[in-house]
Amino acid sequence: MKEEIDAPVSTDASGTDLENARDQPSGEKPTAVDIYLVEWDGPNDPELPMNFPLWKKSLITCIFSTLTIWVTFSSSVFSAAAGITSKEFHVSVEVMTLGTSLTVLGFTVGPLVWGPMSELYGRLKPLYIGYAIFIIFQVPVAVAQNLETLMLARFFLGFFGTSALAIIPGALADFWGPVERAIAISLFSAATFVGPIFGPIIGGFIVDSSLGWRWTAWITMIPASFFGIIAFLTLPETYHPVLLQRRASRLRKETRIWAYHSRLDENTPTFGEILTKYLFRPIQMLFLEPILVCMTIYISLIYGILYLFFVAYPIAFREVRNWKSLGIAALPFLGILVGVLMGCLLVTIATRLWYAPKLQNGSVVPEDRLPPMIVAAILLPIGLFWFGWTSSPSISWAPQAIAGAPIGMGILMIWMQGLNYLIDVYLVVANSAMSANTLIRSAVGAAFPLFATAMYHKLGVDWATSLLGFLSIAMIPIPVIFYFYGAKIRALSRFSPKW
């Protein structure tokens, strides 16, 4: 029972090596008689990432979160330029919305590559490669003279940038314990939302200024490069199998005994195993696992709502309220940011006061993740109806902007606790569950902005947002049912271990 309690690895999503992470932190030597198999020298091994000092763990987490902010920032900053670029390239605003959608579509495909690479080569090599190429693809966006170049560059910067989103959650699991890991992941999750929320605000002021829309790419490239260099100079490798492989290589050179080897040397994942873990099994689980299906639908909805709002907010504040400045019209996004930070704080408190004591007493079950999600499921429709029905120009802008707070809280808490629940439920096949969730979620996030303009123009801000509110109400029973009946449903699963 204790092994299963310590096993859950919290993450935001996306095909990182969660399945291997559950066995890595123990630091215990295997009972096999192979004296040349290199393992950790017990749980207090100074090279074990779990034994990094607190300051080092915190610094690594902050750097990881900063990289995440700039990747997700890039996904939304271009939304502020949709209007002006539609005129420059002689297409509709809906077509230019593809600039945002294609980046999020890159988030869909990327984890299928970066997740396996992190298992084979460690965390840092694929992270650095992907992040560097993400930075490079800002250049064709900034200098594009035709629509095709612009759209292709937006897709590929999403594809390569998602190396951070795919690898960092698993890297955090390498050096944080179960309770502290949940708090570290909350910081990472907040970063995944802070970036896209700031994108339209900063992008709006850039487009309004004399710099022009092309500087939305340059302003992403400059700080992303700066923090990328800091990461390159400071981040250590944390993936346990690769560290042990390096130790084995070092021992071979020092002792001239060529028999020293690590588990990764003798059990390198095959291409077929990787395909099974990241593609075939996720598709199979989407057909067979009701918990995965329902949670994926719910998380995909809130992810789609977030990216839909990059279109809806300018309509609500520029068109309906007649705010002229793109930057000023994007400032109400700060309401969502406040909600995200409040949600992050509430999840951290709930983890400390509710989840951690149960974990310590050995009485924790996956459903203990769900109470904050149930609260969030109620907050989200409240915020959506609040936003929609305070959109009239005859009502002050302040109530509509404040409505972003419960929306942000709802999105963050549903996201975090929903993904944590999936990981706790599926444990050994957590990678496959997260790959399935990432695939569907990112596809929905890419699709929602494409119909947002037509929906809001046709229905109006009030009824269009109310439609989202009704959809979110329909989702409320999901965490409630799983809280009360999740154990019985898990007992029927082919993939969930017995708690």
Swiss-Prot record:
<comment type="similarity">
    <text>Belongs to the major facilitator superfamily. CAR1 family.</text>
</comment>
<feature type="transmembrane region" description="Helical">
    <location>
        <begin position="95"/>
        <end position="115"/>
    </location>
</feature>
<feature type="transmembrane region" description="Helical">
    <location>
        <begin position="395"/>
        <end position="415"/>
    </location>
</feature>
<feature type="glycosylation site" description="N-linked (GlcNAc...) asparagine">
    <location>
        <position position="361"/>
    </location>
</feature>
<keyword id="KW-0812">Transmembrane</keyword>
<dbReference type="Pfam" id="PF07690">
    <property type="entry name" value="MFS_1"/>
</dbReference>
<keyword id="KW-1133">Transmembrane helix</keyword>
<feature type="transmembrane region" description="Helical">
    <location>
        <begin position="327"/>
        <end position="347"/>
    </location>
</feature>
<dbReference type="InterPro" id="IPR011701">
    <property type="entry name" value="MFS"/>
</dbReference>
<keyword id="KW-0325">Glycoprotein</keyword>
<feature type="transmembrane region" description="Helical">
    <location>
        <begin position="187"/>
        <end position="207"/>
    </location>
</feature>
<protein>
    <recommendedName>
        <fullName>Citrinin biosynthesis cluster MFS transporter mrr1</fullName>
    </recommendedName>
</protein>
<feature type="region of interest" description="Disordered">
    <location>
        <begin position="1"/>
        <end position="29"/>
    </location>
</feature>
<feature type="transmembrane region" description="Helical">
    <location>
        <begin position="124"/>
        <end position="144"/>
    </location>
</feature>
<keyword id="KW-0472">Membrane</keyword>
<feature type="transmembrane region" description="Helical">
    <location>
        <begin position="370"/>
        <end position="390"/>
    </location>
</feature>
<comment type="function">
    <text>MFS transporter; part of the gene cluster that mediates the biosynthesis the mycotoxin citrinin, a hepato-nephrotoxic compound to humans due to inhibition of respiration complex III.</text>
</comment>
<dbReference type="InterPro" id="IPR020846">
    <property type="entry name" value="MFS_dom"/>
</dbReference>
<dbReference type="InterPro" id="IPR036259">
    <property type="entry name" value="MFS_trans_sf"/>
</dbReference>
<feature type="transmembrane region" description="Helical">
    <location>
        <begin position="467"/>
        <end position="487"/>
    </location>
</feature>
<feature type="transmembrane region" description="Helical">
    <location>
        <begin position="58"/>
        <end position="78"/>
    </location>
</feature>
<feature type="transmembrane region" description="Helical">
    <location>
        <begin position="155"/>
        <end position="175"/>
    </location>
</feature>
<dbReference type="GO" id="GO:0005886">
    <property type="term" value="C:plasma membrane"/>
</dbReference>
<feature type="transmembrane region" description="Helical">
    <location>
        <begin position="443"/>
        <end position="463"/>
    </location>
</feature>
<dbReference type="GO" id="GO:0022857">
    <property type="term" value="F:transmembrane transporter activity"/>
</dbReference>
<feature type="transmembrane region" description="Helical">
    <location>
        <begin position="291"/>
        <end position="311"/>
    </location>
</feature>
<feature type="transmembrane region" description="Helical">
    <location>
        <begin position="215"/>
        <end position="235"/>
    </location>
</feature>
